[in-house]
């Protein structure tokens, strides 16, 4: 196994909160997959949930070497938790095709949040 890419992102939670206050759920609709959306709608801390997903998806796009552009969209990345609560990532559409072309065999995700910030790191391996 070799590291093919590494991405990290930090999000100011108040910034996400301000966007939601200004434009309602538009950002959440753009960022979240259908499954994540269903969780977000019922989450006790929806702003924090969205900030963490945003950070993971930005970090993942950076790890793939492109960022969110060139056909990649936030909803092509889906964050979920395994049975122990560890964050994992599913890829769809162009993100999945790009990962396959790169030879990605494993994706590692870590995320953390504190009062003001959410931070994520994603490593893609062959």
Curated annotation (Swiss-Prot):
Gene Ontology biological-process entries: fatty acid biosynthetic process
Superkingdom field: Bacteria
Keyword NADP: no
Family annotation (SUPFAM superfamilies): 4'-phosphopantetheinyl transferase
InterPro entries with a match to the protein in the record: 4-PPantetheinyl_Trfase_dom, 4-PPantetheinyl_Trfase_dom_sf, ACPS, Ppantetheine-prot_Trfase_dom
Recorded catalytic activity of this chain's protein: apo-[ACP] + CoA = holo-[ACP] + adenosine 3',5'-bisphosphate + H(+)
Gene3D superfamilies: 4'-phosphopantetheinyl transferase domain
Entry binding sites for Mg(2+): 9, 58
Enzyme Commission (EC) number: 2.7.8.7
GO cellular component terms given for this protein: cytoplasm
Record localization: Cytoplasm
MF-aspect GO terms: holo-[acyl-carrier-protein] synthase activity; magnesium ion binding
Cofactor(s) the protein requires to work: Mg(2+)
Known role: Transfers the 4'-phosphopantetheine moiety from coenzyme A to a Ser of acyl-carrier-protein.
Entry-linked HAMAP family: AcpS
Name used for this protein in its record: Holo-[acyl-carrier-protein] synthase
Organism: Klebsiella pneumoniae (strain 342)
